[in-house]
């Protein structure tokens, strides 16, 4: 009886309807309740590090002074004073003034050659005296003694007058006799040129006469040798 019922057309239709209902119910459940499976992460450590969230670091903007000066830990690098600075005192620093030996010579020559107020007065007085003697010769007796004295006075006055005029006419000195370098002449305001040699104005006090070609045994000792009898 059971076998005939299961093999009947009605039983088969019921079985097929139940199977279709099960398939439809499974589709409805999947549509209503979707199931998301977890994605498999890659096994590469580099790729896994990319998926990790990066920690936010504080944005520190250094100042201009910090950029120029390196950060040095004072505990690791203690400050060391310069050698000998503690013993130096400003009061013991030698201070002085040095002047080139040729400065005095240059100043004296320029003073003697430059015309001054005395030169003007000397020139005017000699000129006035020379004109006065020429005027007095007309009233003096025409004797030999008077003529000789007049000529001597006129010669002296004329010499003084020409010497005064020469100070205004003569060229400027070049100081070629002084041993100066071109830089020294420029600093002193002298004209360029002139003979310069390698000699010193003040030669050194000691000049060693030792030649490196000599041997040690051939060099004589400065101490006087003594002989014993």
Curated annotation (Swiss-Prot):
Region annotation (Disordered) ranges: 16-68, 189-229
One Pfam family this sequence matches: NPCC
GO cellular component: nuclear pore; perinuclear endoplasmic reticulum membrane
Subcellular location: Endoplasmic reticulum
Organism superkingdom: Eukaryota
Keyword Endoplasmic reticulum recorded: yes
Keywords recorded for this protein, A-Z: Endoplasmic reticulum, Meiosis
Main localisation: endoplasmic reticulum
Alphabetical GO biological process terms: meiotic cell cycle; nucleocytoplasmic transport
Main function: Has a role in meiosis.
PANTHER family hit by this protein: NUCLEOPORIN POM34
Protein name, per record: Meiotically up-regulated gene 31 protein
Organism: Schizosaccharomyces pombe (strain 972 / ATCC 24843)
Source species taxonomy: Eukaryota, Fungi, Dikarya, Ascomycota, Taphrinomycotina
